From Swiss-Prot:
InterPro entries: TB2_DP1_HVA22. Keywords: Membrane, Stress response, Transmembrane, Transmembrane helix. One of its GO terms (biological process) is response to water deprivation. It holds the Pfam family TB2_DP1_HVA22. It is a multi-pass membrane protein. It is found in: Membrane. This is HVA22-like protein a. Its main location: membrane. The lineage of its organism: Eukaryota, Viridiplantae, Streptophyta, Embryophyta, Tracheophyta. The chain crosses the membrane at residues 18-38, 47-67, 68-88. It comes from Arabidopsis thaliana. It comes from the Eukaryota.
Amino acid sequence: MGSGAGNFLKVLLRNFDVLAGPVVSLVYPLYASVQAIETQSHADDKQWLTYWVLYSLLTLIELTFAKLIEWLPIWSYMKLILTCWLVIPYFSGAAYVYEHFVRPVFVNPRSINIWYVPKKMDIFRKPDDVLTAAEKYIAENGPDAFEKILSRADKSKRYNKHEYESYETMYGEGYQY
């Protein structure tokens, strides 16, 4: 009976990375992410969002260089240690890697890259930039100034609508501008 338990313990220790890897890299972060969504704190949201960004980058690198990585016998242990460092909030590993390595590349690419992409051509801009700009304008100029801009835009829209309607009356209903 003692040898059976010893053999079982040996198998567990030899395959520790295989057993602990998914728990550390997926199960616990998924649970913690759901808990973070349910709280009002933004600090834990940032922790888990940065973790998932780094997890996806690590997975992408691992899939890209799979043939090279299989030559490293300790890769699974290195990945487990790295993942533990990223996951455990006490170490703030995910925040550190994101702030020092990922953020400079994606948030301010012009400081890293030598090529130039104009702001209008940047396809990676956030869709809520308009909302952010509106909030900033309201904070600086007040809600009354914002209402004036909206009323001017509404008047302009109505004017343009009448312009299109005149084309419709001239050319028929099938006319498209």
